[in-house]
Amino acid sequence: VQGFPTIVFADASGKPFGGFVGGRSKDDVMKAMQDALKNKEALNAAEANVAKATTDEAKVAALMEVLKLAPQEYVDNFYGDVKAEIKKLDKDDKSGLKAADAHADQLKKEQKDVQDYLAGKLTDKTTPAEALQVVKAYPDRDKLLPETQQDLLMMEFGTYLNSTGDVDGAVLILDKVAELMPGTEAGQRAPRIKAGILANKDQIKTQIEAAKKAQSK
């Protein structure tokens, strides 16, 4: 569940084929339902092609189409059998599925390592300046996956801005986030944050100075 309400359209076996998150008007709900039913028809056709496939290569291609049409947030829980079959048949990983799963596993490990590191260093009494040094001291940052490096840079951005009030210096960190991997969520979010803080530069500086004065009392 990603938000309220979360609506899922599923078949009789409970396998999702569409849905949406958040409140919608009656017309939008009907459209979402129609779109989901069209997707279900496409899924049925793709699954039929799997059954018709006469070679491993053709079967992998058909199975990949099933994965493409499946709601991505439910793939691991409800289409795991499809992924497993692709991995079994696709010996040379031409689909890239094995590499993608290995990348995802590595990313999860690195994110947990970062969380554990921060949990052991930061407390509710840690100042932004101290937190900045903790984040910057994370070992071997340049050897991490780009997504993990972006997470650390976003933390560095927040702690740097809150400890120094230096908006211009902070946006340079956001630039690094965007340059590192533009297509990720962080890479897309960084330019929007940059535009927002530059548009409200004086107000942000005032708020940070007020917060620093309050902390020093």
Regions found by a protein language model. Give the residues of each.
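Non-catalytic, surface beta->alpha helical segment in thiol-disulfide oxidoreductase systems
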Residues: 2-43
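A sequence-level detector of short, solvent-exposed, charge-rich linear segments
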Residues: 14-15, 39, 48, 52, ...
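Pro/Ala/Gly-rich low-complexity, hydrophilic intrinsically disordered segments
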Residues: 26-55, 79, 201-208
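Oxidative protein folding and maturation machinery
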Residues: 53-217
